[in-house]
Amino acid sequence: MSDATAALVSERVDKLLADVDPTAVDQAEFRGRQYDLGLAWVHFPEGYGGLGLPPVAQRDIDRRVYSAGAPYPGARHFFGLAMAGPTIVTNGDEAVKQRLLRRTFTGEDAWCQLFSEPGAGSDLAGLATRAVRDGDEWVISGQKVWNTLAHIADRGMLVARTDPEAPKHKGLTYFALDMHAPGVEVRPLRQITGEAEFNEVYLTEVRVPDADRIGDVGEGWRVSMTTLMNERTSIGGGGGGAPPRGSGAIAEAVRIWNEEAGDRSPANRDRLMRLWIEAEALRLTNIRAGQNRRAGNPGPEGSIAKLKFAEVNMAIYELCVDLLGADALVGFGYEMRRAENLGLTGPPGSARKMFLRSRANSIEGGTSEIQRNILGERVLGLPGEPRVDKDVPWSKVPR
């Protein structure tokens, strides 16, 4: 940061901490004041929770406010902070920005993502959920699936088809859905771990005000790319931006090596060191991806980080269960629980459970195969896969 930027950030943080004691007020009040001072998403424009400063300044802001006792927002607000906020500020109209951004940052609105469908996962543009205009409202019906933490969300980032006669990428529109609206039903999807972190969401003639539309009608695909770009980078960072060096899954592997490992062979020591190096390379790649994205210069790092996170996280938990040996076979229970946190990494002692949970890393947020296609076609310039539905109206595409 330049001296001028550092001075401005320091001045604003000093004012924030002088105005509001983070240990004496609730989280929403403190974060509301943080938003008003432009310290929420510091790279956003002024008036929208930012100061138009380089994104690197956010790290200094976060360090100071958390050191002063401000509570960390937690996984419940991950989707709003990492995905909905950037999507709204980039694509929303003035009224949407003023109405939703502050509530998203304070935590008054928790978000979920309503993209995938039973027949549209990797081929997201083939989604079938319909939105039909009725005056100043849209009537939306359809089904979404694999919706993380939808059961505790207030808003949903929803993409629906508004023009079935347009080609599949061109007939979509993006909405900020009220998850408490009549006609919204959330059902749990139980995982191999016993938890129900994911859900399926049924929409039955849900009425959504046109004021809750984000972006122009028919521009849903373009708007959704903003969301997906932020999602991939965030997942690459383990679900919460760039974590400290040596934290997350690799920290659990190191703990097991030091405290519980039954097989400290040279081969396993080599595996541990190689994975520590890969985890650190991934962390640095994700920092670079986040900075480039927030500066408006997104590159391939987001897809690289997402792809490598899946591979490294799975490999780390495989090493954990190998180090535990027979103890890894001891069950951890299969209790049905509606999760309130993202399950990308787990606390100490959860390696058995996380070994099973990590199997989903190469699927969620865009499969590893899709990430390789993106990198091959858009970065390396390789020819794309042949498409039979290009420029064909969605209604005419065989399904």
Residue ranges of predicted features:
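C-terminal helix-coil-helix/basic helical segment that borders enzyme active sites and/or dimer interfaces
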Residues: 25, 266, 280-343
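A structural signal for short hydrophobic beta-strand segments in well-ordered beta-sheet cores
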Residues: 129-132
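Glycine-rich beta->alpha junctions and the first turn(s) of the following alpha-helix
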Residues: 4, 184-285, 361, 395-398
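A short, Trp-centered hydrophobic/proline-enriched beta-strand micro-motif
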Residues: 107-115, 159
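Amphipathic, small/basic residue-rich leader segments at the start of a protein or domain
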Residues: 1-79, 96-99, 103, 223, ...
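Glycine-rich phosphate/pyrophosphate-binding beta-alpha loops
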Residues: 120, 145-151, 192-193, 360-365
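A short core secondary-structure module
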Residues: 136-137, 141-189
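N-terminal glycine-rich flavin-associated loop
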Residues: 73-95, 121
